[in-house]
Regions:
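Flavin (FAD/FMN)-binding glycine-rich loop and adjacent Rossmann-like elements that form
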Residues: 2-169
Length: 169
């Protein structure tokens, strides 16, 4: 029950959510700064409160051609959500042109024993959330949304890209 005053030019919060200052009611700044502010050439045109994309990864296994491991169609599934994730499904030309085909996309997370970690940032299962500034109920709702996005992406891989033989490991 002691008050401690710390004078620092910069503090790095390395907790899971980076929410120590928010929880303590201390003024803070977070997110991506526009390159006009940071001076960095990273392509961030507009500042935002996004700190890091969140991904609920999935581990899929290749059960072999001829096997059908397709999951039930998730609620809210729309393949256009993942349009542009790879060259195999690129319809909306207003989106950035993908640089990889589905095989390379899946090989990004290839593991031993015919398993694949599904963790794809570009029109995949990454989701941008600011969990720091959410209350616990909103966080839980947002995390459910992230899990559902991964399920939809798995279904997209199976149904739209033809990897029906890839199922949960």
């Amino acid at each position: 029950n002691q008050v401690v005053t710390i004078h620092a030019k910069q503090v790095i919060d390395a907790t899971e959510l980076g929410d120590v200052f928010a929880d303590a009611g201390v003024p803070y700044d977070l997110g991506m700064e526009a390159s006009t502010i940071s001076g960095e050439n990273v392509g961030v045109e507009k500042s935002s409160d996004i700190i890091q994309d969140l991904t609920y990864t999935a581990i899929l296994k290749d059960y072999g051609v001829g096997q059908d491991k397709t999951i039930a169609k998730p609620a809210g599934y729309d393949p256009s959500e993942f349009d542009g994730s790879c060259t195999d499904y690129y319809i909306d030309k207003s989106r950035k042109k993908p640089s990889v085909d589905s095989k390379k996309m899946l090989d990004y997370g290839k593991l031993p024993n015919n398993k694949y970690m599904i963790n794809w940032p570009i029109y995949g299962n990454d989701i941008y959330l600011n969990l720091v500034e959410m209350d616990e109920a909103a966080r839980q709702t947002a995390l459910i949304k992230a899990k559902e996005q991964t399920l939809r992406f798995v279904y997209f891989i199976q149904h739209q890209l033809g990897y029906k033989h890839f199922g949960f490991a």
